[in-house]
Amino acid sequence: MSESSGTAFGGRRAIPPNTSNAAENDPPTVELQGLVPRGFNPQDYLNVTNVHLFKERWDSNKVDHHTDKYSNDKLIVRRGQSFYIQIDFNRPYDPTRDLFRVEYVIGLYPQENKGTYIPVPLVSELQSGKWGAKVVMREDRSVRLSVQSSADCIVGKFRMYVAVWTPYGVIRTSRNPETDTYILFNPWCEEDAVYLEN
């Protein structure tokens, strides 16, 4: 039997395998579902205006994660340990009617079951070793989150998005290289495979 010249992904695979986590494929900024009324304006709903990562060398994220000596202007954190981000919205956040979440993506074809697409749920209490985000401060139009990463997540440079749910679908922030987050191994975390006692 001769080889075909077309691209074959093998078996039941619907998408090609990831060959590099450095390659990027951005998720859509608007995912509408069902019928959308004629006058639908995404600006009528909760919108993200800015994201603060507290990524300066003197900020608590870099100091607490022992990454303040890295000469990189991105947020660098260690897996299995919580860090802070602040999201500014176009209006005050109301937890009874607004729903949003932070998403971390790595690689060209991100998938949740492969750990390359991570929708971080808002939780009332963070659990050790699991992804989660807890609201620690609400002030005017800003929300500060404590984000806990999994102790066994992929190590690398993640792209970060904020997704807001509306009655008609999801509105996601655009790709912003300033919100890229490096997640490293954590020898200070007991759940991490590289944990060192001393």
Curated annotation (Swiss-Prot):
Family annotation (SUPFAM superfamilies): E set domains
Predominant subcellular localization, coarse grouping: cytoplasm
Propeptide span(s): 2-38
Cofactor note: Binds 1 Ca(2+) ion per subunit.
Modified residues (N-acetylserine): 2
Cellular-component GO terms for this entry: cytoplasm; extracellular region
Keywords for this protein: Acetylation, Acyltransferase, Blood coagulation, Calcium, Cytoplasm, Hemostasis, Secreted, Transferase, Zymogen
Catalytic activity as recorded in UniProt: L-glutaminyl-[protein] + L-lysyl-[protein] = [protein]-L-lysyl-N(6)-5-L-glutamyl-[protein] + NH4(+)
Listed GO MF terms: protein-glutamine gamma-glutamyltransferase activity
Entry's Gene Ontology BP terms: blood coagulation, fibrin clot formation; peptide cross-linking
Post-translational modification: The activation peptide is released by thrombin.
Domain of life, per lineage: Eukaryota
EC number: 2.3.2.13
Annotated region described as Disordered, given as residue ranges: 1-36
Known cofactor(s): Ca(2+)
Family statement: Belongs to the transglutaminase superfamily. Transglutaminase family.
Complex and partners: Tetramer of two A chains (F13A1) and two B (F13B) chains.
Known function: Factor XIII is activated by thrombin and calcium ion to a transglutaminase that catalyzes the formation of gamma-glutamyl-epsilon-lysine cross-links between fibrin chains, thus stabilizing the fibrin clot. Also cross-link alpha-2-plasmin inhibitor, or fibronectin, to the alpha chains of fibrin.
The protein's name: Coagulation factor XIII A chain
Organism from which the protein derives: Bos taurus (Bovine)
Lineage, top ranks: Eukaryota, Metazoa, Chordata, Craniata, Vertebrata
